[in-house]
Amino acid sequence: MTRSVVTDVPPVAVGGAAGSLLRWGLGHVLPSGSVWHWSTLTVNVVGALLLGLLLEALTRPGVESRRTHTARLLLGTGLLGGFTTYSTFAQELWEQVRSGDTTQALAYAAVTLVAGLLAAAAGMALGTRLGHRASSHARGVVEGAQ
């Protein structure tokens, strides 16, 4: 194993475990068994929003620092990767189609995909805005110190 693999595995594993537990917990809190699988829809849309925000906040021009790299692995790949679930979404769609609810399956798929795209875009916009605010604040602090 290379050094980067050895150092990258722990943050992904810890984040993935935490994200999976959060998803599992939400599955017990939100209603289930309906045409709309609220827990899956919620985790995927919230996950898209947070991933858009996180990646926009972490992807500033320049070389990625070790701290940023670890944060991306822990929070993005690990936490949000474990929190969101494409496989459950696909299984729920297949069950709806197999039981004859094709129209509902298509509606559920469309709502999930559109809401996810909008959430990711909103997260990226928020990340950009927060990044500009942070850099403006940092410039003000530096200018005030001179």
State the predicted function of each range.
Residues 1-146:
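Membrane-interface helix-loop junctions in multi-pass transporters/channels
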